């Protein structure tokens, strides 16, 4: 498993930990070093952007995990 795959897996775990009803669709590759991620809950959908470096660092960096968690929480709250 490479760094991006590990980060994407950790992202999915993070989303499920916040709200199991939310489905996240993460592209396999970033566009311009940014991941455009779709979060769906029922009929509601939000898009968020996460930098490639943050996805790579997500499993190991607590401050990155905290920032990404805040972005995801804000998106879920807006659904």
Predicted features and spans:
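Short amphipathic beta-strand/extended segments with alternating polar/hydrophobic composition
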Residues: 46-53
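Generic hydrophobic secondary-structure signal
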Residues: 37-39, 50, 72, 77
């Amino acid at each position: 498993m490479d760094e991006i795959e590990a980060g994407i897996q950790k992202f999915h775990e993070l989303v499920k930990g916040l709200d199991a009803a939310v489905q996240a669709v993460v592209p396999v590759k970033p566009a311009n070093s940014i991941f455009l991620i779709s979060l769906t809950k029922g009929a509601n959908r939000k898009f968020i952007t996460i930098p490639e470096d943050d996805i790579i660092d997500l499993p190991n960096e607590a401050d990155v995990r905290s920032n990404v968690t805040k972005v995801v929480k804000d998106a879920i709250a807006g659904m």
